[in-house]
Amino acid sequence: MEIETDVVSSTSGSAKVRLANTEILVGVKAELGEPSSGKPDKGRLEFFVDCSANATPEFEGRGGEDLALEISNMLTRAYDCPSCLDLGKLCVIKGQQCWVLYVDILLLECGGNLFDAASVAVKAALYNTWSLDNLCPRLYHGRCFWTPMSHSNCYSQSR
């Protein structure tokens, strides 16, 4: 297995995984957004999977849509577990603002083990995004900034 991180400069984090004849590219974009009404104290992860027609002829046309949905649903269930990723660390202001991580997964080559390779690629890209333990939300005049904890006292309400 080969894992490369920080391979797409226009993303917040990225990874490329090659497992035998399977190759997957993952990019993560982080944006501020609103938390879901059912989880006002947590951030959100949203997965999008694209099965490239170049990966296998079976993906031409609408051939890869069912597989893409299945992989997306599997990842959504896996990351809904607090021990996998603490989405509470993505909360900026409870009920108002959180980080939304958009995880885009592109299947470049399909040689089997798609679920395993996708899981590893997503985990590597999320770890490449940033370390949430080292960041702190700060509000100035209603705007949110994230700064390293070592450079500031952490607080979550504006003065």
Regions found by a protein language model. Give the residues of each.
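Polyanion-binding surfaces on beta-sheet-dominated domains and ring/shell assemblies
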Residues: 1-159
